[in-house]
Amino acid sequence: MIRRITERASGFAKNIPILKSSRFHGESLDSSVSPVLIPGVHVFHCQDAVGIVAKLSDCIAAKGGNILGYDVFVPENNNVFYSRSEFIFDPVKWPRSQVDEDFQTIAQRYGALNSVVRVPSIDPKYKIALLLSKQDHCLVEMLHKWQDGKLPVDITCVISNHERASNTHVMRFLERHGIPYHYVSTTKENKREDDILELVKDTDFLVLARYMQILSGNFLKGYGKDVINIHHGLLPSFKGGYPAKQAFDAGVKLIGATSHFVTEELDSGPIIEQMVESVSHRDNLRSFVQKSEDLEKKCLTRAIKSYCELRVLPYGTNKTVVF
């Protein structure tokens, strides 16, 4: 069951005109100005109960904020509650630290499993590291989206188990923007996971942009934060290597790409985003691969953007809610 509530901000106070006369020597009778309103996002996950939406809405309204959109999801036959609200507020009247405290009070009341606030104009961008192997089409797409301001992240470094020449487009781009590139040579016997953990220890999450190495359970536990992968196939079908060939051999009529959270089980983590494109008997393996690559880069950047905008929440043991 999905409940959606949408409100639009309207009727904000406008500047009061300045009244001038010889008596007041041109001074304003009222020098007030409209407040500077900034956007915020809040996500909430708890056991379902009566009055949660009212409490969260009242919290925003009581501080002079205004809700622009409110999404709620309560799964059928499952006593859990998910919500995501977008609102605007005056940070002078409602300081950033107080926003966290007020929502935390509600979280404690309902025993929330998740309550997160993000204010993009104040909060630092998420720090990420990108891991990849030989192919760089997903990396290039992410770098261009980041350069255009369409990907709200701070790319701390790029790590690869393949060395790249300094005169390539990717390396010149990274050098121009001051993004470190780390070549970490790996073997079947030594995946250099301790070295990678040291490089990414200060990041908020990791992105595997076609990193063709399986991360161990020890690595995932040692990192302790989310890792997002792009798989060049439509999961849960065609797991593992060469999914385009698997799909081609199976005679599918849709080819796809899947972005998902990484777990210890290969290509089996909760799915964040999937994209598909039609194929036919006229396609060959080469066109399958080309279409797959086009989908991969779009699918991955969309998943990262959704994650940064707090649209992705864990649901059950292996699902996600994506608002």
UniProtKB/Swiss-Prot annotation:
It catalyses: (6R)-10-formyltetrahydrofolate + H2O = (6S)-5,6,7,8-tetrahydrofolate + formate + H(+). The active site is at 267. It comes from the Eukaryota. GO terms for molecular function: formyltetrahydrofolate deformylase activity. Its EC number is 3.5.1.10. It is an enzyme of class 3 (hydrolase). Expressed in leaves, cotyledons, roots, seeds and flowers. It is found in: Mitochondrion. Residues 1-25 form a transit peptide. One of its GO terms (cellular component) is mitochondrion. Keywords: Hydrolase, Mitochondrion, One-carbon metabolism, Photorespiration, Transit peptide. One of its GO terms (biological process) is one-carbon metabolic process. Residues 41-124 form the ACT domain. InterPro entries: ACT-like_dom_sf (IPR045865), Formyl-FH4-Hydrolase_C (IPR041729), Formyl_transf_N (IPR002376), Formyl_transf_N_sf (IPR036477), PurU (IPR004810), PurU_ACT (IPR044074). Pfam families: Formyl_trans_N. Disruption phenotype: No visible phenotype. Puru1 and puru2 double mutant shows a 70-fold increase in Gly levels and accumulates elevated levels of 5- and 10-formyl THF. Embryo development arrests between heart and early bent cotyledon stages, and mature seeds are shriveled, accumulate low amounts of lipids, and fail to germinate. Puru1 and puru2 double mutant is only conditionally lethal and is rescued by growth under nonphotorespiratory conditions. Puru1, puru2 and fold1 triple mutant shows no photorespiratory phenotype. Deformylase involved in photorespiration. Prevents excessive accumulation of 5-formyl tetrahydrofolate (THF), a potent inhibitor of the Gly decarboxylase/Ser hydroxymethyltransferase complex. Belongs to the PurU family. PANTHER family: FORMYLTETRAHYDROFOLATE DEFORMYLASE (PTHR42706), FORMYLTETRAHYDROFOLATE DEFORMYLASE 1, MITOCHONDRIAL (PTHR42706:SF4). This is Formyltetrahydrofolate deformylase 1, mitochondrial. It comes from Arabidopsis thaliana. The lineage of its organism: Eukaryota, Viridiplantae, Streptophyta, Embryophyta, Tracheophyta. The gene is PURU1.
